[in-house]
Amino acid sequence: MCATWPSGLRTEFMKSQHQDPIYSQISQVKDAVSEVLEHAKKLGATAAEAAMSSTSGLSVSTRMGEVETIEFNQDGGLGISVYVGNNKGSASTADLNPKTLRSVVEKAIDIAKFTSDDPCNGIADKELLEFSPKDLDLFHPWDVSPEQGIDLCHAAEQAALNADERIVNSDGASFSSHQGLRVYGNSHGLIAGYPRTRHSISTMVIGKEGEHMQRDSAYTISRDQAGLKDAASVGLEAAAETLAKLNSQKLGTMKVPVIFRADIANSLFGHLVSAIGGGALYRKSSFLLDSLGTQVFSKTDRMSVV
């Protein structure tokens, strides 16, 4: 299927693919963060930390072979926390011009004047910081056109619809390819940044057998285009997940070993990570409050990558 889209949007997107190298942008953002921190110091902050990020990219969605949306987006923002003694003030903005950034710092300082003194406030100790962070290989830009994105959506959706006659409808397919950067700095002299990309394909379909209907989805996501699953295989996986739900049966009460799928298991461990997070413990909102040294999982539990 051949798809068309507004020439103005296409021109805007293609221009974005040939902007200054992202590493040059990171250098400029580092300078901006440094200026923000210096301004906070001049206004009386005893410590400060700031993060600035930006993201741009393409998103496409289709449904039943028709293009629903084609979007090019470009977003950015800065957040800063300042500390005046043990008083903390925070502010943020999506407007990154220098005048606005200075104003945001001033607002954060003003907020700090009205917050409670808290001895736990402050930035991380200098000796805990990594001043030479490793390159985690997060940046793999993809010069992909909207037409390619549309074709990938169609391939995923059509593969799902053709997989089985019980797949009767689609909730659509989507494709996205984004790149961006993040820079963090604080008053200990740390200013570091990195570029990042994220590409994804997904689809959701509806299955029917008798009077029973179910829906499910599948997706693939990767920093690197080469790490994405084939679009058709994403569609087949969505169909298989949907069909597996049809005529599902409830289990009786029993005590048995359970193997959780990866997409479910990570949420279970997510609850543990949230419960032992410093913020939850500080607010006394964790079920593991005052549980240091307590055995939480069975000694026979183990995590395996399969």
Question: Predicted segments — roles?
Answer:
Residues 6-306:
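Active-site bordering "gate/hinge" segments
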